[in-house]
């Protein structure tokens, strides 16, 4: 894009109309582009009972703690949650489970949550178990506007029941649908006011995929940085996928700590 200094006054206006030269953003436009919200509750304003939500994280790593707590305090119910797991009894999505706010869970692993097991066995919650890689691809596909895809994972098991199975090059594949949700809640390391996000280490798990899958995405970040501080090649989720940004402190609880005895030679 050419600088305005290279255009004489009369040509500058014509260049802007033709799209050669962009007009500087107005104050109102800058305000509209600012996606930072004062709290998770403000960012989640408008969510209703029965909403579907994609929640990032893997175990307790990289989970959107602030949004989960806000949802608990808001008391919205009959939620359909898509997430790798359902947290533990007293943390993560387990808080919503204990509060009877989740109607259906689409997940890969639920073994760390005793409350989940109790509700499942009592028929109080609907569960759709999905192979982990398939769940990741369903979220990515939904965010990319792909309605479905074929995978060999799950063929010949309960995963493939009531789903279309086709053969390609002599091998069977099951049709899986992309996942699109009303909302997505994710957690990133750094973000800017335009919603560009950068994740750190293992927290870059299901978060980028969930951010794509949500029609409205709320991202909570540890650090808010100036636009441009995150190099383009380090932006993991472009701001086009994010509608709201919340800054806060996170407990980052360790799900399970294991140690290895020192080996003495």
Say what each PLM segment does:
Residues 20-32:
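Short, Lys/Arg-enriched N-terminal segments with co-localized hydrophobic residues
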């Amino acid at each position: 894009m050419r600088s305005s200094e290279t255009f004489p006054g009369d040509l500058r206006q014509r260049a802007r109309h033709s799209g050669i030269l962009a007009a500087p953003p107005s104050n109102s436009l800058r305000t509209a582009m600012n996606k930072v919200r004062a709290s998770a509750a403000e960012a989640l304003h408008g969510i209703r009972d029965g909403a579907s939500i994609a929640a990032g994280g893997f175990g307790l790593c990289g989970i959107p703690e602030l949004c989960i707590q806000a949802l608990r305090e808001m008391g919205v119910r009959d939620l359909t949650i898509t997430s790798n797991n359902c947290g533990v009894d007293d943390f993560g999505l387990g808080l919503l489970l204990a509060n009877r706010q989740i109607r259906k869970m689409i997940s890969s692993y639920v073994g760390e949550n005793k409350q989940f097991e109790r509700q499942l066995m009592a028929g109080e919650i609907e569960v759709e178990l999905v192979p982990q890689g398939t769940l990741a691809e369903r979220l990515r596909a939904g965010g990319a506007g792909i309605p479905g895809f074929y995978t060999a994972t799950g063929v010949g098991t309960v995963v493939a029941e009531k789903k279309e199975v086709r053969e390609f090059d002599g091998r069977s594949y099951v049709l899986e649908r992309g996942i699109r949700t009303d909302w997505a809640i994710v957690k990133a390391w750094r973000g800017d006011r335009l919603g560009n996000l950068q994740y750190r280490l293992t927290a870059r798990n299901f978060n980028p995929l969930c951010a794509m899958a949500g029609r409205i995405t709320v991202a909570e970040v540890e650090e808010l940085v100036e636009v441009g501080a995150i190099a383009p090649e380090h932006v993991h989720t472009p701001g086009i996928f994010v509608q709201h940004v919340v800054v806060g402190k996170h407990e980052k609880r360790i799900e399970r700590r294991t140690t290895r005895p020192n080996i003495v030679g």
